[in-house]
A protein has these predicted regions:
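Basic, polyanion-binding surface patches
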Residues: 2-194
Length: 194
């Protein structure tokens, strides 16, 4: 049970009762059957997500990849999170560099999204050569014509199951509100006019 939730319950019900309730909840949850990974992925394919290219650069090296697993956490301080698969060893570069940029793709960026997803089989250098990149504050590559770009320093890392979850404080940002958005839904790209 999250610590914050437990502390709220303790405030209202008292510590002793909370410990008993938490144990009861944990017993119920431990008896529950987990969903099958394929069924979960199939259901999540109906969850529309903004398409992002996340990038990093620094002493450990440069890397970029396409993902939809990014979201806002807080606006004070401005914080986002990204989820990176552990199976790809090179994703450790994001952790080792301690910085990343989230580049929200416009509707015109489908080929770039494919390139950074690895579908085309390009090297990292070849992927970066396909677009114009700039730097804001951290040194992570920022796509010049991104719909929005969030330049972040890593403030927390949580490993969970198959993924590293990186929390980043937004140090700088830029937006281009006149562009359309690229979204991913039903395992396909779609353009959303703004």
């Amino acid at each position: 049970m999250p610590v914050i939730y437990a502390s709220i319950l303790a405030k209202y019900y008292g510590r002793q009762r909370i410990n008993s309730d938490v144990q009861t909840i944990n017993n119920i949850i431990s008896d529950a059957v987990s969903v099958e990974p394929k069924a979960y992925r199939d259901a999540m394919s109906h969850y529309a997500g903004a398409v992002q290219i996340v990038t990093t650069d620094g002493p450990a090296g440069r890397r970029g990849l396409t993902l939809t697993a990014a979201c806002s956490v807080s606006d004070a301080p401005a914080t986002v999170l990204i989820c990176l698969q552990k199976i790809h060893e090179d994703n450790r570069l994001f952790i080792e560099n301690g910085v990343f940029a989230i580049n929200t793709l416009a509707g015109t960026h489908q080929q770039l999204a494919d390139a950074f997803s690895g579908r085309i089989g390009l090297t990292q250098n070849e992927r970066f050569e396909l677009a114009t990149w700039e730097r804001l504050a951290t040194g992570a590559p920022v796509l010049a014509d991104a719909l929005a770009a969030f330049d972040c320093r890593v403030v927390s890392i949580q490993d969970h199951s198959t993924h590293h979850v990186l929390f980043g404080e937004v140090i700088a940002l830029r937006s281009n509100p006149d562009a359309s958005a690229l979204i991913y839904l039903n395992r396909r790209y779609h353009t959303l006019d703004l």
